[in-house]
Amino acid sequence: MRIAILGGTYNPVHIGHIFLAKEIEYLLNIDRVIFIPTCNPAHKLIDENVSVSNRIDMLKLALENEDKMFIDDCDIINGGITYTVDTISCVKKKYKNDKLFLIIGDDLFQNFDSWKDPQSIVSSIELVVAHRIYKERLKSSFKHIYIDNKIIPISSSEIRNRIVNGLPVSYLLPFGVLKYIKDNNLYVKKVNV
């Protein structure tokens, strides 16, 4: 089986994530896309008002009608700071006989040499770079594949900011995720009284 790995905070998961997963299915002839929510990513802070449980619930809602997309909670179970090299080690144990592809955006790829043990990553899995912010391909000495995907110019941080400022986000999120955010008052300004 050909399996693509998409790690991220998914805070919140949005249509850009789902669209990229669909593009990956098509462009790389992928049988399964596995979303791996990070516990505490090494490269960013997570809003403490949104729990790991909230992020996983939103992912479940976003993927409920997708038959090739699944969630793996290996990073959550391991806890602590999440490093991709450790995630890959965990995933390779579960999918020993499968061809694995790690998908990262070019925004992360531009600093790939600063990741923990990047050479080990590219030696153990196919690294696939998706366009996220750059139209041209970035050069690197690390072995990788570039895909010519459509760029959907949205981000989770932009969605959080729009919610805080009362701006519409309904077409940026799967409906179930939008409803979950509203029902749980996520990302809204907290007023101290």
Curated annotation (Swiss-Prot):
Pathway: Cofactor biosynthesis; NAD(+) biosynthesis; deamido-NAD(+) from nicotinate D-ribonucleotide: step 1/1. The keyword Nucleotide-binding applies. CDD domains: NMNAT. Keywords: ATP-binding, NAD, Nucleotide-binding, Nucleotidyltransferase, Pyridine nucleotide biosynthesis, Transferase. GO terms for molecular function: ATP binding; nicotinate-nucleotide adenylyltransferase activity. Its EC number is 2.7.7.18. It comes from the Bacteria. GO terms for biological process: NAD biosynthetic process. It catalyses: nicotinate beta-D-ribonucleotide + ATP + H(+) = deamido-NAD(+) + diphosphate. PANTHER family: NICOTINATE-NUCLEOTIDE ADENYLYLTRANSFERASE-RELATED (PTHR39321), PHOSPHOPANTETHEINE ADENYLYLTRANSFERASE (PTHR39321:SF3). Catalyzes the reversible adenylation of nicotinate mononucleotide (NaMN) to nicotinic acid adenine dinucleotide (NaAD). HAMAP family: NaMN_adenylyltr. Belongs to the NadD family. This is Probable nicotinate-nucleotide adenylyltransferase. It comes from Borreliella burgdorferi (strain ZS7) (Borrelia burgdorferi).
